[in-house]
Amino acid sequence: MGFIIAIAKRFDALVGPGVMLLYPLYASFRAIESPTMLDDQQWLTYWIIYSLITIFELSVWRVLAWLPFWPYLKLLFCMWLVLPMFSGAAYIYSNFVRQYVKIGMNVGGGTNYTDEQRRVLQMMSLDARKSVQDYVDRFGWDSVEKAIKAAEKETRKH
């Protein structure tokens, strides 16, 4: 029983490096090798946020030492940033960072999207965005809109 309690108390130290460093490192390597820029956005944003968290920790470490729950909060936040089902880093980028930093932005590969098209793409998972971006690059955005309308029409039938 003491072993389980010891693991529970140090859960952040056991899982943290894998969640906060190893998986993002692996995913960043994959993102660099992929032809699309959408996953680059997720991982570059993650590393920026992780760096800011680290700078924050180094700046106020004396205060954080008095907060026993800080490592667990950091772990949960980083899990939200990293896990593909949440894509928290991409969410933070699209909802906060992007509003203040616009440097000739386009969502991906050189195709300029309207704000409405960007919103539609941001609602999708990273893999779905990649697929739609590839489809748009091949066939154009009009074909995506036709496919969406056809799917809506089909769902109304059933």
Curated annotation (Swiss-Prot):
It holds the Pfam family TB2_DP1_HVA22. InterPro entries: TB2_DP1_HVA22. Keywords: Membrane, Transmembrane, Transmembrane helix. It is a multi-pass membrane protein. GO terms for cellular component: membrane. Its main location: membrane. The chain crosses the membrane at residues 2-22, 41-61, 63-83. It is found in: Membrane. Belongs to the DP1 family. This is HVA22-like protein f. It comes from Arabidopsis thaliana. The gene is HVA22F.
